[in-house]
């Protein structure tokens, strides 16, 4: 999206706001519309830094970011994500690896939480 116009970027932000409100309603309400828009803009910037430029890959990056946190790629909490995102891979391959690793992380978290109960 780095090459897209400001108008195209804002259309994409609005599309992603609606998407998140539909599929993640509680989470979206907890942020509010303005903060959700800022979250998405931040995600677009982070995705672009890692070589993701298509709407599909940026949307997928936003889903990972929503699940792991807005700065998952640099927080130190997920060193595997930082290593993966710094690898020289085609964007689609990098995204596939990122999604698989994030899914694994979320499943491991779910199991840890279930074992605490």
What are these regions (language model features)?
Residues 1-117:
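A contiguous, surface-oriented mixed alpha/beta subdomain in the mid-to-C-terminal portion of proteins
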């Amino acid at each position: 999206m780095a090459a897209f116009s400001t108008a195209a970027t804002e259309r994409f932000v609005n599309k992603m706001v609606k998407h998140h409100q539909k599929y993640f309603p509680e989470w979206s309400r907890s942020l509010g519309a303005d903060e959700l828009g800022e979250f998405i803009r931040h995600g677009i910037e982070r995705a672009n830094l890692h070589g993701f430029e298509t709407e599909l890959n940026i949307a997928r990056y936003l889903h990972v970011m929503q699940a792991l946190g807005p700065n998952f790629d640099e927080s130190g909490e997920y060193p595997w994500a930082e290593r993966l995102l710094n690898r020289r891979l085609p964007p689609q391959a990098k995204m596939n690896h990122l999604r698989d690793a994030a899914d694994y992380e979320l499943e491991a978290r779910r199991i840890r939480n279930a074992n605490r109960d």
